Amino acid sequence: MDPCDCSKSGTCNCGGSCTCTNCSCTTCKKSCCPCCPSGCTKCASGCVCKGKTCDTSCCQ
């Protein structure tokens, strides 16, 4: 279950550089922000997005 309710209005700021709309949270699962695409194996469930690309710096 995704802890981020993306149906809420507002802005979701994941980490220092990832921003997605229609969220109201500060930490997101990979499905919430584009920097953590669903196919990114480096981003575990409940990750905090740190970047916009799927690499070692994407999530902490």
UniProtKB/Swiss-Prot annotation:
Residue ranges for the region (Alpha) are 29-60
Q: Which residues bind a divalent metal cation 1?
A: 4, 6, 20, 23
Positions annotated to bind a divalent metal cation 7: 49, 54, 58-59
Residues noted as binding a divalent metal cation 6 in the record, renumbered to the chain: 36, 40, 43, 59
In this chain, a divalent metal cation 2 is annotated as bound at: 6, 12, 14, 25
Give UniProt keywords alphabetically.
Metal-binding, Metal-thiolate cluster
Q: Where is this region: Beta?
A: 1-28
Q: What residues does a divalent metal cation 4 bind to? A: 32-33, 43, 47
Read off the Pfam families from this record: Metallothio
Q: Recorded GO terms, molecular function? A: metal ion binding
Query: In terms of domain of life, where is this protein from?
Result: Eukaryota
Residues binding a divalent metal cation 3, per UniProt: 14, 18, 23, 28
Binding residue positions for a divalent metal cation 5 = 33, 35-36, 49
Note on domains (UniProt) = Class I metallothioneins contain 2 metal-binding domains: four divalent ions are chelated within cluster A of the alpha domain and are coordinated via cysteinyl thiolate bridges to 11 cysteine ligands. Cluster B, the corresponding region within the beta domain, can ligate three divalent ions to 9 cysteines.
Functional summary from the UniProt entry:
Metallothioneins have a high content of cysteine residues that bind various heavy metals.
Regarding protein family, the annotation reads: Belongs to the metallothionein superfamily. Type 1 family.
What PANTHER family does this protein map onto? METALLOTHIONEIN, METALLOTHIONEIN-1X
- This chain's protein is named Metallothionein B
Gene name for this UniProt entry:
mtb
